[in-house]
């Protein structure tokens, strides 16, 4: 009988609990024991582990956040810290590890695998910034949260004939801004992958105003710069009445969508099956609605391809 360790690491994402549930229940179904590790790699080094059972994951599929909590851990980034982690895992007779998180979490799983400890990664991040998978757990829910906010902001924007800048998460990847902006009917979408000047944005505002449209929504990915700075510069160039909304951590919360719950469930079960097959240093993901797995190193080496077609479509539809 295998014993599986399970942790969530990095930024939380809606659907992580659904993945936790899937790992625990499928592992027990296959006759395994599961230890939940609280607060990620930090909790592992502090031996904050709890054996999980079926009731541990009851009534959590609909909950946002992660019942295992999450944190970041500088000590784990050191060789000494990782050796300590392996020693603790062996102390609890844990045979393998499932890590739910993003690229940093996967890098940690790779390091453990390099030390001979089997680990599998499940993609959980709202940014959707992992190139090897079409979607990450939490992305769909975060998009829906943003779209809901854009709709409400548009109501007041149109009432007062204002330009509203909505800042969303996405340091290096503009997927949240792009797809939420497209689905929310934003007049301008600003992402890290496409260079656009303040003058160009101001010209778009002036053009729409000349057509008689007195309000606009600009969706800005945080990785491009701050919404407040953009507001000041646009005010100078366009003279428009502007307001800023920074959605912040509200994007990470909320009950996961159907898509995220199903994705998390499928990935969780597949991760357990890989471990039972003796696989290690791999991540699971989804491509064209099929569950895939590949080496962590290969997954992290892939470069995210920006959806230029969707971006151009958004420009066409925002005239």
UniProtKB/Swiss-Prot annotation:
<feature type="binding site" description="in other chain">
    <location>
        <position position="222"/>
    </location>
    <ligand>
        <name>substrate</name>
    </ligand>
</feature>
<feature type="binding site">
    <location>
        <position position="162"/>
    </location>
    <ligand>
        <name>substrate</name>
    </ligand>
</feature>
<comment type="function">
    <text>Catalyzes the phosphorylation of D-fructose 6-phosphate to fructose 1,6-bisphosphate by ATP, the first committing step of glycolysis.</text>
</comment>
<feature type="binding site" description="in other chain">
    <location>
        <begin position="125"/>
        <end position="127"/>
    </location>
    <ligand>
        <name>substrate</name>
    </ligand>
</feature>
<feature type="binding site" description="in other chain">
    <location>
        <begin position="185"/>
        <end position="187"/>
    </location>
    <ligand>
        <name>ADP</name>
    </ligand>
</feature>
<comment type="similarity">
    <text>Belongs to the phosphofructokinase type A (PFKA) family. ATP-dependent PFK group I subfamily. Prokaryotic clade 'B1' sub-subfamily.</text>
</comment>
<feature type="binding site" description="in other chain">
    <location>
        <position position="211"/>
    </location>
    <ligand>
        <name>ADP</name>
    </ligand>
</feature>
<feature type="binding site">
    <location>
        <position position="11"/>
    </location>
    <ligand>
        <name>ATP</name>
    </ligand>
</feature>
<feature type="binding site" description="in other chain">
    <location>
        <begin position="213"/>
        <end position="215"/>
    </location>
    <ligand>
        <name>ADP</name>
    </ligand>
</feature>
<keyword id="KW-0324">Glycolysis</keyword>
<keyword id="KW-0547">Nucleotide-binding</keyword>
<dbReference type="GO" id="GO:0005524">
    <property type="term" value="F:ATP binding"/>
</dbReference>
<feature type="binding site" description="in other chain">
    <location>
        <begin position="249"/>
        <end position="252"/>
    </location>
    <ligand>
        <name>substrate</name>
    </ligand>
</feature>
<feature type="binding site">
    <location>
        <begin position="72"/>
        <end position="73"/>
    </location>
    <ligand>
        <name>ATP</name>
    </ligand>
</feature>
<comment type="subunit">
    <text>Homotetramer.</text>
</comment>
<dbReference type="GO" id="GO:0016208">
    <property type="term" value="F:AMP binding"/>
</dbReference>
<feature type="binding site">
    <location>
        <begin position="21"/>
        <end position="25"/>
    </location>
    <ligand>
        <name>ADP</name>
    </ligand>
</feature>
<keyword id="KW-0479">Metal-binding</keyword>
<dbReference type="InterPro" id="IPR022953">
    <property type="entry name" value="ATP_PFK"/>
</dbReference>
<keyword id="KW-0021">Allosteric enzyme</keyword>
<keyword id="KW-0460">Magnesium</keyword>
<dbReference type="GO" id="GO:0003872">
    <property type="term" value="F:6-phosphofructokinase activity"/>
</dbReference>
<keyword id="KW-0067">ATP-binding</keyword>
<dbReference type="InterPro" id="IPR015912">
    <property type="entry name" value="Phosphofructokinase_CS"/>
</dbReference>
<dbReference type="InterPro" id="IPR012828">
    <property type="entry name" value="PFKA_ATP_prok"/>
</dbReference>
<dbReference type="GO" id="GO:0006002">
    <property type="term" value="P:fructose 6-phosphate metabolic process"/>
</dbReference>
<feature type="binding site" description="in other chain">
    <location>
        <position position="154"/>
    </location>
    <ligand>
        <name>ADP</name>
    </ligand>
</feature>
<dbReference type="InterPro" id="IPR012003">
    <property type="entry name" value="ATP_PFK_prok-type"/>
</dbReference>
<dbReference type="InterPro" id="IPR000023">
    <property type="entry name" value="Phosphofructokinase_dom"/>
</dbReference>
<dbReference type="GO" id="GO:0042802">
    <property type="term" value="F:identical protein binding"/>
</dbReference>
<dbReference type="GO" id="GO:0046872">
    <property type="term" value="F:metal ion binding"/>
</dbReference>
<feature type="binding site" description="in other chain">
    <location>
        <begin position="169"/>
        <end position="171"/>
    </location>
    <ligand>
        <name>substrate</name>
    </ligand>
</feature>
<dbReference type="GO" id="GO:0005945">
    <property type="term" value="C:6-phosphofructokinase complex"/>
</dbReference>
<feature type="binding site">
    <location>
        <begin position="102"/>
        <end position="105"/>
    </location>
    <ligand>
        <name>ATP</name>
    </ligand>
</feature>
<keyword id="KW-0808">Transferase</keyword>
<keyword id="KW-0418">Kinase</keyword>
<comment type="pathway">
    <text>Carbohydrate degradation; glycolysis; D-glyceraldehyde 3-phosphate and glycerone phosphate from D-glucose: step 3/4.</text>
</comment>
<feature type="binding site">
    <location>
        <position position="103"/>
    </location>
    <ligand>
        <name>Mg(2+)</name>
    </ligand>
</feature>
<protein>
    <recommendedName>
        <fullName>ATP-dependent 6-phosphofructokinase</fullName>
        <ecNumber>2.7.1.11</ecNumber>
    </recommendedName>
</protein>
<dbReference type="GO" id="GO:0070095">
    <property type="term" value="F:fructose-6-phosphate binding"/>
</dbReference>
<dbReference type="GO" id="GO:0048029">
    <property type="term" value="F:monosaccharide binding"/>
</dbReference>
<feature type="binding site">
    <location>
        <position position="243"/>
    </location>
    <ligand>
        <name>substrate</name>
    </ligand>
</feature>
């Amino acid at each position: 009988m295998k014993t599986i360790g399970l942790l969530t690491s990095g930024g939380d994402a809606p659907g992580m609990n659904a993945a936790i549930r899937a790992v625990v229940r499928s592992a027990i179904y296959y006759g395994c024991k599961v230890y939940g590790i609280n607060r990620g790699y930090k909790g592992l080094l502090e031996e904050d582990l709890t054996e999980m059972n079926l009731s541990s994951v009851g009534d959590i599929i609909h909950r946002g956040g992660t019942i295992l909590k999450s944190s970041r851990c500088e000590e784990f980034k050191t060789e000494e810290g990782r050796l300590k982690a392996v020693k603790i895992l062996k102390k609890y007779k844990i045979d393998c590890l499932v890590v739910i998180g993003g690229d940093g979490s996967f890098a940690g799983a790779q390091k453990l695998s390099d030390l001979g400890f089997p680990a599998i990664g499940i993609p959980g991040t709202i940014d959707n910034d992992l190139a090897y998978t079409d979607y990450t757990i939490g992305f769909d829910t975060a998009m829906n949260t943003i779209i809901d906010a854009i709709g409400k902001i548009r109501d007041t924007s149109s009432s007062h004939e204002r330009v509203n800048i909505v800042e969303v998460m996405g340091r290096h990847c503009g997927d949240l801004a792009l797809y939420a902006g497209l689905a929310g009917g934003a007049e301008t979408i600003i992402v890290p992958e496409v260079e656009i000047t303040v003058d160009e944005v101001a010209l778009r505002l002036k053009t729409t105003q000349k057509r008689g449209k007195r309000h606009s929504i600009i969706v800005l990915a945080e990785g491009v710069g701050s919404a407040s700075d953009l507001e000041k510069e646009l005010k100078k160039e366009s003279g428009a009445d502007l307001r800023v909304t920074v959605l912040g951590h509200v994007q990470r919360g909320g009950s996961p969508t159907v898509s995220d719950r199903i994705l998390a469930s499928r990935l969780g079960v597949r991760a357990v099956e890989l471990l039972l097959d003796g696989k290690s240093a791999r991540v699971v993901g989804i491509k064209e609605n099929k569950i895939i797995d590949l080496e962590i190193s290969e997954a992290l080496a892939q470069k995210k391809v920006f959806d230029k077609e969707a971006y151009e479509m958004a420009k066409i539809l925002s005239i």
